[in-house]
A protein has these predicted regions:
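Conserved two-metal-ion catalytic palm core of "right-hand" nucleic acid polymerases
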Residues: 1-262
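Active-site palm subdomain of RNA-directed nucleic acid polymerases
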Residues: 233, 270-288
Length: 288
C-alpha cells in the first residue's frame, strides 16, 4: 500500500536551496550537492575548531565559504566571499541530434545565492506574482511537501543500509520555493485550460525564447523591477534589491553582464522576474 506523508520543512534553513539549484536530470549521475549541504550544516559541530584541521574544513573555509575562516579579518572574509567565480561548463544530450550546454555554478556563488534567498525570498515572490500568464513561477517559500512511500517495502527490516540520499529525500523537497503553474511544459498542453483556449482561438503565435539565457543583459533585471529611468537616477544606491541581484549574477558568471548561466534554478528565477515585466507590459498594451 502506498502511504502519502506530509513532510514539514524548516523555512529558516536557507541552505537547502543548495539541494535544488541543479536538477538531477541536468547533472552526471555521480554528482550532487548533498555532500556540500551536509558539510556546511554540520560545520559548527565537526570542524569549527582551529586546532582540528581536516581537508574538508580547509576546503570549506578557503574555497567555499570564507565567512567560516576566523584566521582572517571580517573585511577580508567579505572581500573573498564576493569575488567573481567562473561556472563549470558541460554538455548533456538534448535529443538524438543536439546537446544542451549547461553551467555548474561555483560552490561559493551557490552559497551566495542561498543567502540572497534568505534575505530577499519575500521580495522575489512578491515580484513573481504580477503576471497573469506565467507558466511556472515561485509562489512562496516551501514549508512542506508530500512523500509517497510503499509501506510494504518498509514493513520488514531489510539488509540495505540507510543512505544519505534516502535521508535527504525524506527531509527536503525538490525545490526551495513552492511553484505555481506547471512544472513541465507538456503539462500545459495537456491541461484543461489549454484545451479551452484551443476551442476559443483558431490561431496560436509562439515566440521561441529557448536561447534567451545566453543574451539576457543582467542590468535589465533592475529595469524590470523598477524602470530604466529610475535605476539610472539612483544608480549609486547599490543596496537595492535589483542592483544586488544584478551584481550577484555577474559575480557568479565571471563578471559577465551579457548572458546568465544555463541550468541553475537561480537563473530561472532571475529570468522569471524579467519575463513577468514583459507579460505585464504586453497585457497593458493589449488592454489599452
Amino acid at each position: 500500500m502506498v502511504i502519502k506523508k506530509n513532510i514539514k520543512l524548516d523555512k529558516k534553513d536557507y541552505l537547502r536551496a543548495l539541494l535544488c539549484d541543479t536538477l538531477p536530470g541536468d547533472c552526471p549521475i555521480i554528482f550532487s550537492n548533498d555532500g556540500l549541504y551536509i558539510n556546511l550544516t554540520e560545520y559548527d559541530r565537526v570542524c569549527n575548531d582551529l586546532l582540528h584541521f581536516t581537508p574538508v574544513s580547509s576546503f570549506l573555509k578557503k574555497i567555499v565559504n570564507p565567512n567560516l575562516d576566523s584566521s582572517i579579518s571580517v573585511a577580508d572574509r567579505h572581500r573573498e566571499k564576493k569575488k567573481q567565480s567562473s561556472p563549470f561548463g558541460y554538455c548533456i544530450v538534448k535529443d538524438a541530434f543536439s546537446q544542451r550546454h549547461l553551467s555548474l555554478i561555483h560552490p561559493r556563488s551557490q552559497i551566495n545565492y542561498s543567502e540572497f534567498y534568505k534575505t530577499y525570498s519575500s521580495v522575489i515572490t512578491l515580484n513573481t506574482l504580477k503576471s497573469n500568464f506565467s507558466i511556472r513561477y515561485p509562489r512562496k517559500v516551501a514549508n512542506s511537501f508530500f512523500l509517497y512511500e510503499n509501506n510494504a517495502l518498509e514493513k520488514y527490516k531489510g539488509e540495505d543500509i540507510e543512505t544519505t540520499k534516502d535521508e535527504l529525500m525524506r527531509k527536503y523537497s525538490s525545490s526551495y520555493f513552492s511553484y505555481g503553474g506547471f512544472n513541465r511544459i507538456y503539462k500545459l498542453f495537456q491541461s484543461k485550460m489549454f484545451i479551452e483556449l484551443e476551442k476559443r482561438f483558431s490561431v496560436m503565435w509562439m515566440l521561441d525564447v529557448s536561447h534567451c539565457f545566453d543574451s539576457i543583459y543582467t542590468h535589465s533585471v533592475s529595469w524590470a523591477l523598477k524602470n530604466k529611468s529610475y535605476i539610472k537616477k539612483h544608480v549609486k544606491h547599490s543596496n537595492q534589491f535589483g542592483q544586488e541581484l544584478d551584481t550577484l549574477m555577474q559575480r557568479s558568471n565571471n563578471n559577465e553582464t551579457n548572458g546568465i548561466p544555463i541550468g541553475s534554478e537561480f537563473s530561472r528565477v532571475f529570468a522569471e522576474l524579467i519575463f513577468q515585466r514583459i507579460d505585464c507590459n504586453i497585457e497593458s498594451c493589449l488592454l489599452s
